[in-house]
């Protein structure tokens, strides 16, 4: 997926040509209006903010959270978009749950204190050998290779 974001002066012809190019290289163009961070990052960062809030408050540890997301919503969202999920579950269900749950979700405008603490200690993630988790160079190589292989497999399954 590649976000196609035309400016105010961008012609329809240019947008169509960009979308055609995206399709030719094997991706799905998604046309949208400009918004800070673009749509994909905004959705990702909303998820990350809530995940970090749950860890910061001691509701769940990082390992449990990764398992929960990987085998819960991540697994589901690989095959159905959020708007389709709403229709499948029922808008009345979303309304009932959202009426009490939305008020308890994180609305913080700040970066997680956990993240800031880790950065302050020089723990920037895999590139420094550790962030939330610790990594050896061999583990990093294995994780990156496994991720690439799984992404290819998921893409093939979605295209089937």
What are these regions (language model features)?
Residues 27, 44-48:
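Structural/interface elements that position substrates and couple domains in central-metabolism enzymes
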Residues 1, 47-51, 96-101:
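A general alpha-helix detector
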Residues 1-10, 14:
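Conserved phosphate-handling catalytic cores of large alpha/beta enzymes
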Residues 7, 35-40, 57:
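Glycine-rich "substrate-gating" loop/helix at the edge of Rossmann-like oxidoreductase active sites
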Residues 45, 55-56:
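AAA+ ATPase "lid" subdomain C-terminal helix
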Residues 39-40, 47, 89-93:
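Mid-domain beta-loop-alpha active-site segment that forms a flexible
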Residues 13-16, 23-34, 56-57, 62-160:
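NAD(P)-dependent Rossmann-like dehydrogenase/reductase catalytic/cofactor-binding core
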